[in-house]
Amino acid sequence: MTVAEKPAAGASAGGVTPPADAPNLKPPKSARRPEAPSAASKTEPSADSLAIAGLVPLSTVDWPGKLAVAVFLQGCPLACPYCQNEAILDPKVPGAVPWSQVEALLARRAGLLDGVVLTGGEALRQAGVVDAARRVREMGFGVGLHTAGAYPRALAKTLPHTDWVGIDVKAMPDDYAAATGFGAGAKAWQSLDAVLEASAERACPALAAEAADADGMVERADCMFEPAGADRTVERAGANRTVKRAGANRTVKRADVGPLDYEVRTTVYPGAPATERFEELLGELRARGVRNFALQEARTDGTPVDFRAQALAWDRRAWAKRLDEMVDAASRAGFESFEARLA
């Protein structure tokens, strides 16, 4: 992708505040080590603290079906061999675009754009992304998020201000060290579960209202398995939602959020862990309730030298056969939506 729209001379994105759950993992020698998380601040970091590597002022590919500004955030803890954004992985590189420039662009294009996609790098590596998503929403735009799921706590804070998530599942949980250089599989799949849960809750108005009982336990209404004759209605008044059930009357104040859409995508290439265990990975995704899936064939353009050299030795005929097998398996897996993005 081309990163465009540089700031005026002298502009700076300022310092970077990483989230509290940065992976504590040992990278390979060839990988850049992410910054250690700073001490938690009493005040949530501002969007003005974001280190932004660049932006694409009009994108039709980063959020399916939407016209969006793609904002590329600096830094990523992973070392995926096929990464096409290698130049923006180093978290120590200062930002090139101030957040104020993003907001100025949005102000000029109100009514023309659907939203903003926060991508990277790994967008959730910087704690200011939560404020950024909130501010974009306040300006009347939708918020899309690209993530590999390495920061589940940061994701949990950002999801209430997000309308669409594109989450990369790199491999089965125990293959992440081989696939990305870091053993972040447990966190990545935890993040996937969080996206699926949030999407299910926000698809059902009843689930959008939650209340704690006297013991502090959360009572959740399940709109898919509603007992016959259950006495429950859901009323909305601004940000207040009242749930009446079996004589109980609980009111919950909650952000006025709409549905959360998502896409799970897996990138494959010859010899990749995801390629070797693709059918098993599909089964796990379906078992967890994934509805929307995209299979992506890795491209070599703009990737690290080592990956391009490796690609020269691929058996193209064998790869074409294996790729056809994976596309066929995914198309028959039962996803509500499936897309194959071939190089």
Residues covered by each model-derived region:
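Canonical Radical SAM [4Fe-4S] cluster-binding loop centered on the CxxxCxxC motif
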Residues: 50, 54, 61-97
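Short glycine-enriched, charge-decorated loop/helix-capping segments at active-site entrances
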Residues: 86-93, 178-184, 307-316
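Auxiliary Fe-S-binding modules of radical SAM enzymes
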Residues: 2-65, 202-205, 212-215, 223-224, ...
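A secondary-structure boundary/capping signal
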Residues: 72, 119-120
